[in-house]
Amino acid sequence: MILNKLITKTLGVISIFALTTTMTFAAEPNMTVPHQYPKKYTPEYIKQITPGYKDVGKDEVFYVALDMLKDTEGMFSRNAILGNNLSEKPVRIEFRNLSEINAEYATFDALGWKKGKKLYIYINTKHKDAPAGAIAALLAHEALHQDEYNSLAEETYAWTMEAVVWNDILKLYPESNQEQYPLVTRENTLKRLLEKGNYTNKYIKKAVLSNSGYKNLPSYSPGFDNL
């Protein structure tokens, strides 16, 4: 399934897993280790693109991840994070120890939160060293949860988007497939489900419907009426 559908909702609260409320950001970006980036992302190139991404947060890897979404099915997500949402402001992204928010969140990969009109995405610190391409795919999923509502249809679409974007990333940047990282394991699992379903959401939908974490979700939510 090629995901060309543009969802009209703006980025919001229900993320893949959970929520939080507060955050702070340093003025200068945090540098990361070279293995995270494709070769084109030299220090000079990153310095060049930083002004376009610095408002999302302090970690340089987010700038690279968002830039890697260019020429993928994740462009809508990229644009939403950069400010094409109801708040008309960039979504703030941060690595967090999620257990400090709630012990139940310790193993979660990502959280989303809407506080007033401000929008946030938090990524588990265990993924801080993951390849930027895997973080890009995760962000493509997160950016589809755009209000306080969630549903099985919405999760199915978001997981499928993540798989499609990861597939695109590997075509553009095959060096992103560093299997020693848990986030890459996650992305490859989704990619296999996508391939098994002949690039439809068939098996991803089955995984969503069987996920105990989603057992109380309604079938549909605004903007997601096809399951």
Question: What does each model-identified segment do?
Answer:
Residues E28, V33, Y37, Y41-Y120, ...:
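Auxiliary, metal-adjacent structural segments of Zn-dependent hydrolase domains
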Residues A137-Y149:
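Active-site recognition of the HExxH zinc-binding catalytic motif
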Residues D55-D59, G116, K128-A137, S151-E155:
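Solvent-exposed, acidic/flexible segments
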Residues I2-L11:
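Bacterial N-terminal signal peptides that target proteins for export
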Residues T24-A26:
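Boundary at the C-terminal end of the N-terminal hydrophobic targeting segment
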